[in-house]
Amino acid sequence: MKSIAIIGGGVAGLEAATNLSRMGFSVTVIEEKDQPGGKLNQWHALFPNRRPAAEVLASLKNHAKLGINMMLNTRVENIEKNDDGFALALNHNRMITAHAVLLATGFELFDASKKEEYGYGIYDNVITSVDLEQAFEKGIIKTAEGKIPKKIGFIHCVGSRDEKAGNPHCSKVCCITGVKQAIELKERIPDSEIFMFYMDLRMFGRHFEELYKEAQVKHHIQFIRGRLSEAFENQDNTVMIKIEDTLLAKPLKMNLDLLVLLVGMQPSHGIDKILHDLEVEKDADGFLKQADSQLTPSKTNVPGVFAVGTVTGPKTIGETISDARAVTLEIANYLHNKVASKILKNESYFI
């Protein structure tokens, strides 16, 4: 039985593992955390239909139970390529072998504290979109002082489309995440005022535009085109922001009870050593380079090493699931062709 090692037990890794196992392969998922699910564990509800994240995660976990070796709290320390495939050295002096390797290590969230002018980690009432999502999960939406926020601002593209931050790419999901979160806030705090400060709004997915219109028409959420220049904390712990309204070409000051920073996706650096060992190439933006972004998007430059999900760039969960299902066919074809090649090389033995 051909074996496959999947590094990363998030959405992409779990879905790929399930499908590969159903195809009859021996699958090992290597996850460095104490539970699978990746960033989905941090989320409350998903756009655009606000389906509970826990529901999607439970489905992925249940399917992945079938015939899969799940190694939690496990880290790959070294990989070596050999004639049969790959030898993976793990922490605690463990070793496994595999005929193919699938990189599913996902992304990292931008560290908002690097944008000091925004005040995250400095001012108590400046939070990130992830912090807000976890507050939704707990059912407690309050300021640091325990008050219900009545005036809330969202800043788009924090750590995305920002060359100074080293991330010139668009994170793809921040705009719709902000809209979804703003609507949920408005439903929980009907008398609140909510302001969205953006560079450009990119509602590319199905039903995204409808959700954006709902935010404006039904919930009266205000969208202001402009970039935050600075945030200050007032004596009462409210946050004052300075923004330039780029449509009106006017500076703007506003006091807020809560400021939410929509943090973007950036490449994960947790497997840099592995990539170096295998000589897997990265793109200029730091995400893994696809062998052919149109025809073979899951292949890397190294035969037998595949990549799936947000390790190759920002994606929605739906796109990640589709990517994971597609890569299973790529891996199956690779292993089938490898077996066929060995048979052809040895055909003289049967003549």
Describe every region a protein language model picked out:
Residues M1-I351:
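Residues forming the flavin
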